[in-house]
Design a protein with these regions (language model features):
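Glycine-rich phosphate/pyrophosphate-handling loop used in enzymes and phosphotransfer proteins
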Residues: 1-187, 191-222
Length: 222
């Protein structure tokens, strides 16, 4: 209700063309979603379907990425995360939705949980809001099945190797895992892949047989 009222009082402008009404107008959204990201997020090889080629062994079974973290996509993500533009949740869910294939009925959407510090700063869990929107579009359940360990701090300035080593201790299961379900982890940015690998590994160790991943944007080039 508040978001609708705010949209009337202070309407958004399209981040790409400037048209009044929404963060990304229908024409610009159609244009952006038509430009599919077709590279493996780990090595940059051209792929046909998902964004992970067959040469990499990971704790997750498939990965989809909407695009690179640049231009309009970068601005939408950054404003959503750092400037409390909550309306961006629906737009980012649309971008993820456009990249994903048909999903089976046994899929459960699992957001990467934000840190307590960022929750206090933003006032919301940014990936949980996107998970709710995506679940609504796909008519699938979402569950916050991952919990961050309170004694582990994420350091973004560390080297890739150090981040991957540290990431093993990021998460623990928040509740019971059904081995008959497929779990789709969603996150906003893929950099080294350490966070999603740790999340997938956590779910697998808790009993999940199949874990897939969907991310909005790849930061930098492989």
């Amino acid at each position: 209700m508040f978001d609708k009222l705010l949209a009337i009082i202070a309407p958004h402008y399209c981040y790409r063309c400037g048209k009044i009404g929404s963060i990304l107008c229908s024409n610009c959204k159609k244009y952006i979603t038509s430009r599919q990201y077709t590279s493996c997020v780990l090595c940059g090889r051209i792929v046909k379907k998902a964004n992970l080629c067959g040469t990499h062994r990971q704790s997750y079974d498939a990965l989809w990425c909407f695009g690179l973290r640049q231009g309009v996509i970068k601005k939408i993500i950054d404003d959503y995360k750092f400037h409390r533009v909550r309306a961006a949740a629906a737009v980012l869910a649309d971008l993820l939705d456009s990249r994903l294939p048909t999903l089976s009925d046994d899929v459960v959407i699992v957001p990467i949980p934000t840190t307590s510090k960022n929750m206090r700063r933003r006032g919301y869990d940014h990936m949980l809001l996107i998970a709710k929107q995506l679940a609504k579009r796909r008519n699938l359940p979402y569950r916050p099945l991952l919990r961050r360990r309170n004694n582990v701090t994420q350091h973004f300035t560390k080297s890739s190797k150090e981040r991957k080593r540290q990431a093993r201790y990021f998460f623990e299961p928040a509740s019971m895992i059904d081995p008959d379900k497929t779990y789709l982890i969603i996150d906003d940015i893929f950099t080294t892949g350490a966070t999603i690998s740790a999340a997938a590994d956590c779910l697998k160790k808790a009993g999940a047989k199949r874990v897939e991943v969907a991310v909005i944007a790849r930061h930098g080039k492989p």
